[in-house]
Regions:
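Bacterial N-terminal signal peptides
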Residues: 8-19
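Mature extracellular/secreted ectodomains of secretory-pathway proteins
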Residues: 43-179
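Boundary at the C-terminal end of the N-terminal hydrophobic targeting segment
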Residues: 22-36
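Terminal, positively biased "leader/anchor" segments
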Residues: 35-38, 110
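N-terminal secretory signal peptides that target proteins for export/translocation
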Residues: 1-4
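Conserved, charge-rich beta-strand/loop surface module that forms ligand/interface-binding patches
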Residues: 28-29, 41, 45
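A generic alpha-helix preference that emphasizes hydrophobic side chains
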Residues: 19-23, 91
Length: 180
């Protein structure tokens, strides 16, 4: 067997393994429908984009994701883990549920029950409306601010929309205020 052919036989399987691993990192969470991957359905396009990115972040750094919801949304870590691993909730749904609950001053279990009762076909906007929390309301604003804060905690880049830029400024402006 020539050296070139032998090299190709060794390199090709390695390349296929690496390509498979790269594709797996971008795969949706188990149990997530293809529709859910296209849009999280919060009623706010900016929030939807961030929630889908949170799915990617949580797939790569599940412990950091769970720490974030436990620490800043006061969701017990064991409960978040159960939603993620046993009930197969996508990270975006866990994040949205717990930070919406915190922003609207609702018990997190009430928001989780509302989501579960509505079923997988229901959007988060429908669930939030049923809880009397409409997109554009103050709790939604607090949710948007929480997303920015999470990205800052994770030291993850985020593109703010015009409203958030006016409210929060850029990262350099947010960092000194976060330290206080």
């Amino acid at each position: 067997m020539s050296l070139r052919l032998r090299s190709a036989c060794l390199i090709l399987p390695l390349a296929l393994c690496l390509a498979g691993a790269a594709l797996a990192q971008e795969a949706p969470a188990a149990g997530a429908s293809a529709e859910a991957v296209v849009a999280a359905g919060s009623g706010d396009a900016w929030v939807d984009r961030q929630l889908l990115d949170i799915d990617r972040y949580a797939a790569r750094y599940p412990d950091s994701f769970l720490d974030e919801v436990a620490r800043y949304a006061q969701l017990p870590r064991g409960y978040a883990e159960a939603l993620l691993r046993e009930r197969r909730w996508p990270p975006r749904d866990i994040y949205f549920a717990c930070f919406l609950a915190k922003a609207a001053r609702l018990p997190y279990r009430e928001v989780v029950r509302a989501r579960t009762s509505a079923g997988p076909a229901a959007s988060w906007a429908e669930v939030a409306n049923a809880l009397q929390v409409e997109p554009g309301s103050l709790p939604y604003r607090a949710l948007r601010h929480a997303i920015v804060a999470s990205y800052d905690h994770w030291d993850r880049p985020i593109v703010l929309d015009a409203l958030l830029r006016r409210q929060l400024g850029d990262r350099a402006q947010r960092d000194p205020s976060a330290a206080q």
